[in-house]
């Protein structure tokens, strides 16, 4: 399933359960982040959604591309770079809290984690 974001034509893929990028795997109130695969460069609700829907594994966003947004806030649909995302516990645009447990999966999403 794919959902176009409100602020751009960027699609978010995955086993989505709502229009704020929550998915079958992660669906708490704070699970509103979609992340970009370093291989196909598409945004997915989580690495598990990606891997279940593709023939290639989710690869982390390369450090050389950290200046390019690779995170979408599902609440407001704005994009963030790795550093913008890592530097806060909530969206800098809409103030929606991010799930602090996502840090446990950082290695799946960002090359240097």
From Swiss-Prot:
One biological process term in Gene Ontology: protein import into mitochondrial intermembrane space
Compartments it resides in: Cytoplasm; Nucleus
Subcellular location, principal: cytoplasm
Xref: SUPFAM superfamilies: CHY zinc finger-like (SSF161219)
Binding site for Zn(2+) 1: 23, 25, 46, 49
One term under GO cellular component: nucleus
UniProt name for this protein: Uncharacterized protein C29B12.12
Pfam families: zf-CHY
The entry's keywords: Cytoplasm, Metal-binding, Nucleus, Zinc, Zinc-finger
Zinc finger annotations (CHY-type) as residue ranges: 16-96
Binding site for Zn(2+) 2: 73, 76, 91, 94
GO molecular function list: GTPase regulator activity; zinc ion binding
């Amino acid at each position: 399933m794919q959902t176009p974001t409100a602020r751009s034509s960027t699609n978010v893929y995955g086993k989505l359960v709502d229009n704020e990028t929550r998915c079958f795997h992660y669906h708490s109130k704070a699970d509103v982040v979609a992340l970009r695969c370093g291989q196909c460069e598409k945004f997915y609700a989580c690495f598990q959604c990606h891997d279940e829907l593709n023939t290639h594994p989710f690869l982390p966003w390369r450090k050389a591309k950290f200046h390019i947004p690779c995170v979408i806030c599902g609440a407001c649909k704005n994009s963030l770079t790795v550093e913008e995302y890592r530097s806060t516990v909530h969206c800098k645009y809409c103030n929606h809290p991010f799930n602090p447990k996502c840090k446990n999966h950082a290695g799946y999403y960002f090359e240097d984690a």
